[in-house]
Amino acid sequence: MTTNRFCEITHELQHLSKLSEQCARIDPALYAKYDVKRGLRDINGKGVLVGLTEISDVCSTKMIDGKLHPADGELYYRGYNVKDIIDGTSENSHFGFEECTYLLLFGKLPARTELTEFTKMLSEYRTLPTSFVRDIIMKAPSKDMMNTLARSVLTLYSYDDLADDISLPNVLRQCLQLISLFPLLSVYGYQAYKHYHDGASLFIHPPKAEYSTAENILHILRPDSQFTPLEAKLLDTALIPVSYTHLRAHE
């Protein structure tokens, strides 16, 4: 088996690694002396307050008789319990990821017409530049999906004529485009990985304008593009708790 010289670990590297390790040790006592919060945790394991936000909150304790006790976790977006939002999508027969994205970005739940227009806007942004899939995603595909996403997002910079414009309208435009494109970048990257590294058949389905984010993921992921309404609803529900993390990734 031949070794790529670009990736070869030589004896010199082994020696230098040991030198680097020896000079990178810090006396644990110094953390206590200077009150350093390792891993943003107090010595008792409690998280350190480093900022304030009105966007989301996680409640994992309850006050009982003046003492904090562990409790089933509750996630809140802009003051709304995520469980209530999910229940509302079931009652009103709409998808929740787009609704939560609107809520997180603009601070309120959208009216039906606002949600329709917002979903339409995301759909219109769900188009990759010409030859992007062939030239960027399909060439030298990575085994690491997060690496694939990172490379794709960084490369989109080269296709953006206003990449360095930090005005609020332009940054919002970039955020909405990335939110719209993440199903394509992630699934196409996965298809390239499966084809080049696992020998699977390669297929690329274009997104459908009438589909939600969850529906498009299933549509472009499956060879026959088939999925059930229940599968789409379950995936949409799974996307809701990670929508804030996804939003933070674009900040």
Stretch-by-stretch model annotation:
Residues 2-23, 165-172:
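Beta-strand-enriched accessory nucleic-acid recognition/scaffold domains that flank the catalytic cores
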Residues 11, 15-16, 21-132:
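An N-terminal structural lobe/cap that precedes and organizes the functional/catalytic core
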Residues 53-65, 76-87, 111-116, 139-147, ...:
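Phosphate-binding glycine-rich loops and adjacent basic patches that engage nucleotide phosphates
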Residues 110, 129, 182-183, 249:
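Proline-rich low-complexity regions
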Residues 136-244:
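Glycine-rich, mobile lid/loop segments that gate access to catalytic sites or pores
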